[in-house]
Amino acid sequence: MRNRRVARYSRRSFLAGTGAVAAGVSFGPKFTLAAEEAKLNFYNWDTYIGETTLDDFKDASGIDVTMDLFADNDELFAKLKEGNPGYDLIVPTNDFVERMIKAEMLVPLDHGKIPNFKKNVAKAFQDAEFDPGRKYSMPYMWGTQGIGYRKSRVDGVPDSWKWLLDSDKYAGRIALLAGSSAAIGMALKYLGHSYNSVDPKEIKQAEDLIIKQKPHIKVFAEDNGQDLLLSGEVDLTMEWNGDILQVMEEDDDLAYVVPKEGSIVWQDTLAIPTDAPHPDNAHKFINYILDAEAGAAIADFIQYATPNAAARALLPDDYSKNSAIFPTDETLSRCEPEVYKGEAAQRLRDEALTRILAA
């Protein structure tokens, strides 16, 4: 999820466009460091941050950010499950926030240290079923999952998961996401079930469908389906909307669609893991990200939907009114949020994916 390739604006050109440079407005206040050393260890999706955000934060605060990358939530969870190796801030998706709360892997946030949350974030994101009261997580970005495709190489718009999961028409030209939730969840949607089904029979149906389709699938991609699409290695890929939007900037033959059977709507968050060595610095960085100008620069660069209303207001219509970034109500009506289903249900999916990959 969330893999950035090319910039649209640098921080300076973005701020110049909004008049902020001329007005002498900075990205954030200079922070007074407390007892913590001026370091922050950030565990994030692949380059899922603004082009200059880390440097800008260092200029504003004196805090040096080191960023490590993970490919999916499973990797994030596994990395921290046996103990925090030293991270201060992580970016779990909504269902994994709930999972990590139950596993006591997150610490409560001090909202008093994050004033930009109430000031700038849209009211719809100021509470969450997966984290009531936003006790453990702050909203970062949100979006959908669907099909990225090369228009000149397919016959029409691939408006059904059938194109990827139940047809040999594009054999050898299809990529699926490798995560168990993504592949099995979309197979469940295609079969008319809930993405969040915990019924072993329904999960087995999804497994059987993908195994049957496997000879026609070129690759189960580790969050790089957009790169395979851009390079011409595949013509259809299961991917996150922002990843496809990024490569659409480089090639106007590429497009994105949410299939008619529906998909998921997800929300990525900012959270502090248990035993974080620099929790105060993590709070400062969260508040910085939720600043209007900083948040706008990040959203414009990575092309995902920001929950930061103040940031969205600063961005042009080709972002703020783009239905591939901010889906229509009709599209959202066909989507459902992924929820934490319990460890037993997660094992069912993980084991099903293991059998799929081994088939």
Segments from the language model and where they lie:
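Mature extracytoplasmic/periplasmic domains
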Residues: P273-R334
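Extracytoplasmic ligand-binding site segments that recognize negatively charged/polar headgroups
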Residues: V91-H216, A221-L230
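A ligand-binding cleft/hinge motif common to bilobed small-molecule-binding domains
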Residues: F96-I101, L230, L236-D253
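Conserved C-terminal helix/tail region of periplasmic/extracytoplasmic solute-binding proteins
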Residues: D329-A359
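A bilobed periplasmic-binding-protein/Venus flytrap-type ligand-binding module shared by bacterial periplasmic
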Residues: G148-R153, K189-Y190, Q267-H278, I286, ...
